[in-house]
Amino acid sequence: MPFTFKQFHVDDSHCGMPVSTDGVLLGAWAPLTQAKTILDIGAGSGLLSLMAAQRSEAVIQALEIDPLAAQDCQHNIDQSPWSDRITLIQADLLQWYPLAQTQAQTQFDHILCNPPYFDNGPQSQCSKRAQARHTDSLAFDQLLSAIKQLLAPTGKASLILPNASLGRFLPLLAEFKLKLSARVDITTAPNKAPQRHLLCLSHAVSSAESSEAIEAEHLSIRDASGAYSQAMVALTQAFYLKL
């Protein structure tokens, strides 16, 4: 379904996962200050790449494994004001990044990823949606290994995860000497339990540093009246048409 933002348009007709609040939250929140190079892992329709291009002057590489989703991504890039700064790569991350390390651009100032998150249970009947949503196609340890290798020494990686995945994801950081540098717990309304978590990762000096707790911020998407909260409006108003 086509989706129009303030400065760009997204057609996600062939993508396993359509434009979602998760993606918009991640694209609006990721700390891109001073990032000159950005990698978007699992770009899908190109939403995160386009949001990053609007928010920064960075050169962006959008990596997408699915050929049909990659077609949507390229179309959306071509129709945007930033086609000169976004390059689509149609490839499997696990096959691509070892080769990328032999080339000039081997590390990135920022990495964006809205990763697969269902790792058990029956997969969707739609194979594209299943691939986009299940960690069978990209396990967390594989993702973190790639981030570890591709992230510049002072770089950051931003992700969004559902609450059910957080307990499995965070203990893996120590294995790859990565640490949380920021976290926002997302609720749908006040006094609700968090359903999503925005995470920002950076390199850790030691495994012990990986395990250090940080204080999480909190964001409620809607207020008590059911309208978008002030915090949600402040975060996303540069993108959503009606805010």
From Swiss-Prot:
One annotated Gene Ontology cellular component of this protein: cytoplasm
Reported function: Specifically methylates the adenine in position 37 of tRNA(1)(Val) (anticodon cmo5UAC).
Entries under Pfam families matching the protein: MTS
Protein name: tRNA1(Val) (adenine(37)-N6)-methyltransferase
The entry's keywords: Cytoplasm, Methyltransferase, S-adenosyl-L-methionine, Transferase, tRNA processing
Main location as per UniProt: cytoplasm
UniProt-listed Enzyme Commission number(s): 2.1.1.223
Organism (species): Shewanella loihica (strain ATCC BAA-1088 / PV-4)
GO MF annotation: an example: rRNA (adenine-N6,N6-)-dimethyltransferase activity
